[in-house]
Curated annotation (Swiss-Prot):
Sequence similarity: Belongs to the TSC-22/Dip/Bun family.
Reported function: Transcriptional repressor. Plays a role in the repression of hematopoietic precursor cell growth. Promotes IL2 deprivation-induced apoptosis in T-lymphocytes, via repression of TSC22D3/GILZ transcription and activation of the caspase cascade. Positively regulates cell death in response to TGFB3 during mammary gland involution.
GO annotation, biological process: negative regulation of hematopoietic stem cell proliferation; positive regulation of apoptotic process; positive regulation of programmed cell death; positive regulation of transforming growth factor beta receptor signaling pathway; regulation of transcription by RNA polymerase II
Subunit structure of this chain's protein: Forms homodimers. Forms a heterodimer with TSC22D4/THG1. Interacts with histone H1-2. Interacts with GNL3.
PROSITE patterns: TSC22
Name this polypeptide is given: TSC22 domain family protein 1
Biased composition (Low complexity): 115-144
Subcellular localization: Cytoplasm; Nucleus
InterPro entries membership: TSC22/Bun (IPR000580), TSC22/BUN_CS (IPR047862)
PANTHER family: TSC22 DOMAIN FAMILY PROTEIN 1 (PTHR46745:SF1)
Gene3D superfamilies: Single helix bin
SUPFAM superfamilies named among the record's database cross-references: Delta-sleep-inducing peptide immunoreactive peptide
Amino acid sequence: MKSQWCRPVAMDLGVYQLRHFSISFLSSLLGTENASVRLDNSSSGASVVAIDNKIEQAMDLVKSHLMYAVREEVEVLKEQIKELIEKNSQLEQENNLLKTLASPEQLAQFQAQLQTGSPPATTQPQGTTQPPAQPASQGSGPTA
């Protein structure tokens, strides 16, 4: 019988502390000091203030960790953007080179494949093979 009586009292005390904690926490967030929002000077009031301070410290810690993580992620994304821009530039240069080295027949065949939607895998190795690049290097060889 005694254990049944202690449980409601302990629960009531917990609810009382939680209610005062919630009021204290909300008032600190709102920055208001209303007459209706006051903590008593008892030990429960001091523990509420201590808990309130711990929560604020934890929130500050979480905030600083999140800010650090966001800064790190921004740096990673900036680096990825820089790498993608460089790769895009390189691919554009290669594309322009292949266009200049490809014969008109190869370009026409490639355009036809793009329009029909068939994969350009059969013409792509022909455009990227070494023989078209060799005449260009041979042409620059005698002039040097």
